[in-house]
């Protein structure tokens, strides 16, 4: 009986701690608006680099924004030419025309990184010389 009472108290406090921690973590992430991230970004891997323009113009799908750039370079980087993007609380997702994700870029201190199962890594950085990003 003593063990059961102790176990129930322990389980209660663990559940309480996780609910407090989980609630504060979720509330600390903010979804940026497209206007905060729009502009020309530099996309690169180990072999190639190209400029990508993230716009705040919505695509017909409704929840993604238009993306423009050199189609040959974009097809090389993503395996197909992406059509759009959407912000997330911890990064941004490059999408096809229907909104399916092609790559997720996590916002890290040294840039925005997408890592793929085959070992490839892409990096995006805002182009600081572009007036849209200032």
Swiss-Prot record:
Protein name: Alkaline proteinase inhibitor
Taxonomic placement: Bacteria, Pseudomonadati, Pseudomonadota, Gammaproteobacteria, Enterobacterales
Record-stated family: Belongs to the protease inhibitor I38 family.
Molecular function (Gene Ontology), one example: metalloendopeptidase inhibitor activity
Native source organism of the sequence: Photorhabdus luminescens
Gene3D superfamilies reported for this sequence: 2.40.128.10
Disulfide linkage: 50-73
Signal peptide location: 1-26
Compartment annotation: Periplasm
Function: Inhibitor of the alkaline protease.
């Amino acid at each position: 009986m003593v063990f059961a009472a102790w176990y129930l108290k322990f389980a209660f406090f663990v559940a309480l701690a996780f609910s407090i921690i989980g609630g504060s973590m979720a509330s600390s992430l903010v979804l940026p608006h497209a206007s905060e991230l729009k502009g020309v970004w530099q996309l690169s891997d180990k072999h190639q680099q190209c400029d990508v323009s993230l716009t705040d113009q919505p695509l017909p799908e409704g929840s993604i924004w238009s993306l423009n750039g050199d189609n040959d370079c974009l097809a090389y980087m993503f395996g197909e030419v992406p059509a759009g993007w959407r912000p997330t609380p911890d990064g941004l997702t490059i999408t096809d025309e229907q909104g399916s994700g092609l790559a997720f870029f996590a916002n890290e201190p040294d840039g925005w990184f997408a890592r793929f199962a085959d070992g490839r890594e892409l990096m995006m950085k805002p182009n600081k010389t572009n007036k849209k990003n200032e």
